[in-house]
Each structure stands twice: as structure tokens, then as C-alpha cells.
């Protein structure tokens, strides 16, 4: 693949927006395009789960920052699409631009939003394990693989892919302590706890 056809190639730079998070564009490309929810659904999810931390001036995590940037980028694309729709005279050209934005750029934004929301929700390691598991599953001939693809929300309990290094120690359950009959005081939430 030459630099002009790289999905995120720009000005001769081979920039992969997932690299710093341990993933790659290729790893996400194993997931079919219809796997990713609509941009609207992903934005609603991000807003419902992470609105406070996304709107906060505090730096919460690289995933929050990447999510903010993807949301802002989509907003700018929608502004451009609206401008094109209002100013391009030729309906065929207008449709080509709108379809290109929705199909190509929309998919990239859906992938970015899904990846960062999933990392915040399930943890980066779990999402990476899921991507590897799905990649292995999809490349295995149907006769030799389980009928159903791995599911992200159940992956921590059923994954076959293991992290390198020591396996986590199992703790033996401690005896139950008697609970105090008096109500506990709740600490007030600090600004850092929003993240």
C-alpha cells in the first residue's frame, strides 16, 4: 500500500491514531463496518457515560482527549457537509460529497468513537484482547471456529487470549465482617473523581 492510499496518510505522514493505545487501524479493520453503531448512537453513549469528564477542563486520560478530538472533528465535518449541501449547485456532486463523508469519514469516526468509549468502559487491555480474539476468530475457517464471534462485554470471563507475564493471583475470600448498624458517611466527590 503506498502512502497516498493509507487510511490516515496525510502530507506523507503515516499516522495511525490507535498506535499510542496499543492498537492499529489494521486491527480495527477486522471488525465489519456494520459492527460499529451510528455516530449519533455513539455520541449519545459518550454523552450519557462521560459528559462531565468530557466537558471538564481537567485532563482525565488520553482516551478522554482522543474522544473530545473525534467529537470536535465530527462537528467540523458536519459543518462542512452543511456548507457543501447549501452551496454546491450540482445535485450529483453534492450527493457524491455527502456519500463520501458518510461512508468513508463516518466509518473512521465511528471506529474512533467506539474504540475510545469501549476503552473507557471496559478497559484498554480488554478491548485489545477483544480485537485480537475477533481477528483470530474471523480469520479461522468456519469449519474450525466456534459459531459465534467473541463478545466484548463477556470477554474478561471467557477469553482464550491471555496477557503475557504472570497470571493474576486468586485471593481467598476473607471472613465476612459484621456491618455497623450506623449509617456510613459519604465523602463528597472531588473534581478528580469525575474521570
Swiss-Prot record:
Biased composition (Basic residues): 161-188
Role: Self assembles to form an icosahedral capsid. Most capsids appear to be large particles with an icosahedral symmetry of T=4 and consist of 240 copies of capsid protein, though a fraction forms smaller T=3 particles consisting of 180 capsid proteins. Entering capsids are transported along microtubules to the nucleus. Phosphorylation of the capsid is thought to induce exposure of nuclear localization signal in the C-terminal portion of the capsid protein that allows binding to the nuclear pore complex via the importin (karyopherin-) alpha and beta.
Sequence repeats, residue ranges: 167-172, 174-180, 182-188
Modification Phosphoserine, positions: 167, 174, 182
Region (3 X 7 AA repeats of S-P-R-R-R-[PR]-S): 167-188
Molecular function per GO: DNA binding; RNA binding; structural molecule activity
Family classification: Belongs to the orthohepadnavirus core antigen family.
Name the UniProt record assigns to this protein: Capsid protein
Protein's cellular compartments: Virion; Host cytoplasm
Residue ranges of the motif Bipartite nuclear localization signal: 170-187
Annotated region (Disordered), positions in chain: 148-195
UniProt keyword annotations, A-Z: Capsid protein, Cytoplasmic inwards viral transport, DNA-binding, Host cytoplasm, Host-virus interaction, Microtubular inwards viral transport, Phosphoprotein, Repeat, RNA-binding, T=4 icosahedral capsid protein, Viral penetration into host nucleus, Virion, Virus entry into host cell
Positions of region (RNA binding): 189-195
Amino acid at each position: 500500500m503506498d502512502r497516498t492510499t493509507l487510511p490516515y496518510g496525510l502530507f506523507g505522514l503515516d499516522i495511525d491514531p490507535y498506535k499510542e493505545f496499543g492498537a492499529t487501524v489494521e486491527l480495527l479493520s477486522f471488525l465489519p463496518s456494520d459492527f460499529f453503531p451510528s455516530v449519533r448512537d455513539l455520541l449519545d453513549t459518550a454523552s450519557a457515560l462521560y459528559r462531565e469528564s468530557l466537558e471538564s477542563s481537567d485532563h482525565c486520560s488520553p482516551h478522554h482527549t482522543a474522544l473530545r478530538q473525534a467529537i470536535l472533528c465530527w462537528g467540523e465535518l458536519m459543518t462542512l457537509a452543511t456548507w457543501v449541501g447549501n452551496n454546491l449547485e450540482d445535485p450529483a456532486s453534492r450527493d457524491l460529497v455527502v456519500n463520501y463523508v458518510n461512508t468513508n469519514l463516518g466509518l473512521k469516526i465511528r471506529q474512533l468513537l467506539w474504540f475510545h468509549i469501549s476503552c473507557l468502559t471496559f478497559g484498554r487491555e480488554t478491548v485489545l484482547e477483544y480485537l485480537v480474539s475477533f481477528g483470530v476468530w474471523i480469520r479461522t475457517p468456519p469449519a474450525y471456529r466456534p459459531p459465534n464471534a467473541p463478545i466484548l462485554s463477556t470477554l474478561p470471563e471467557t477469553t482464550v487470549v491471555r496477557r503475557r507475564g504472570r497470571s493474576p493471583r486468586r485471593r481467598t475470600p476473607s471472613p465476612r465482617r459484621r456491618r455497623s448498624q450506623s449509617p456510613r458517611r459519604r465523602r463528597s466527590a472531588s473534581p478528580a473523581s469525575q474521570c
